[in-house]
């Protein structure tokens, strides 16, 4: 019998290419991992994060609707020709995000997916279903079309997956795992030198809020959301950017001025204020750490007024008592409101005086410098007042913006007086009675009875169809 001598080293050397080839081949042919679908139903995460979920759910207690147009009818004139002249309520709890955008008169009464005045982008800050659709269809797919197209898809209120990477193992273990669920927000943060992945924990906390509490506009044919920060975040920087690209949100129906509508620029105003400069974040003031019944600390998701949790918020830094700080804040708020009203009065007159000049035959060339002043004045006013907490976030910046708005409005009216005189008009232009919201809306020609009736029909007929379809598709809990 012949004995065979086995050279182990030789065999191993022959097998190495085989193993290497097999390994590489397996790597190349393995199917790519399927991305985890964003789970938009907030109640899914209640078992893992019960305290956070219940406190988030408690935002439903912030249910009061405050009619800002009824409080200040001048707004109707300033927004003439724009949906905000129909309806503008002050913000309430996150639990009403979807309900409020459905029921506001601004979104109209569409009969089908291709109908209505507004684009899909108007859903963008209302629901984790937005993140789900962007992941599923891409940004172009999500933004395409009218607002009504999203009705059966966007059904869960702003919640967990808007701010957290809920699919991550760390989130399942109880970690926050913050994320920017809106890609356009991530690009904007990168544009100002703040890539989210490289930001510290405190920066990330405010950046997450800044996905929505921010100024933005609808860009291009697809009306995609973009933040106007290319030239900087101050009011003049954004104004310059908008002028450079010749953007306007609408044309005021009285003065025919191409206007800008500020949204809710809390991130920009917070950045400009003392809290932002010292990295006191949105979370520190609006979502403090509190104790549950067992004494365990958790982040309170009932986002609200810091004075409601004074010991856990303001008192962490300030030595003054609650009453003293409330007095300071109230005085700042009053100062801003007083100047706000003065600017609005100037702008109301400017819009009606511009209308009189146009009616008297003023040319486009004659009106251009006047309309530029009106546009810039109202933009600066709007950026100040659209940030509801500016008296707390950046009162000095708020007063500065309103001061420059007053100057611009005065410039417009001075030019208008000269132009009107060349048309033989030297008397004061009369302003109609706008002492109530209803009278102001009548003055700009709105048929509010018809608008409200159409909306009520939409609420009764279309919204139930959306919800039924969402339940059938498993997007909404039964």
Swiss-Prot record:
Alphabetical list of PROSITE patterns matching this protein: MULTIHEME_CYTC (PS51008)
Stretch forming the signal peptide: 1-26
Note on cofactor: Binds 1 Ca(2+) ion per monomer. Binds 5 heme c groups covalently per monomer.
Residues annotated as binding heme c 1: 122, 125-126
Protein activity control: Subject to competitive inhibition by sulfite.
EC identifiers of the protein: 1.7.2.2
InterPro entries: Cyt_c552, Cyt_c_NO2Rdtase_formate-dep, Multihaem_cyt_sf
Residues at which Ca(2+) binds: 215-216, 261, 263
Compartment(s) where it occurs, according to its Swiss-Prot or TrEMBL record: Periplasm
A GO molecular function held by the record: nitrite reductase (cytochrome, ammonia-forming) activity
Binding site for heme c 2: 160, 163-164, 301
Coiled-coil intervals: none
Family: Belongs to the cytochrome c-552 family.
Protein function: Catalyzes the reduction of nitrite to ammonia, consuming six electrons in the process. Has very low activity toward hydroxylamine. Has even lower activity toward sulfite. Sulfite reductase activity is maximal at neutral pH.
Protein name: Cytochrome c-552
Native source species: Escherichia coli (strain K12)
Recorded name of the encoding gene: nrfA
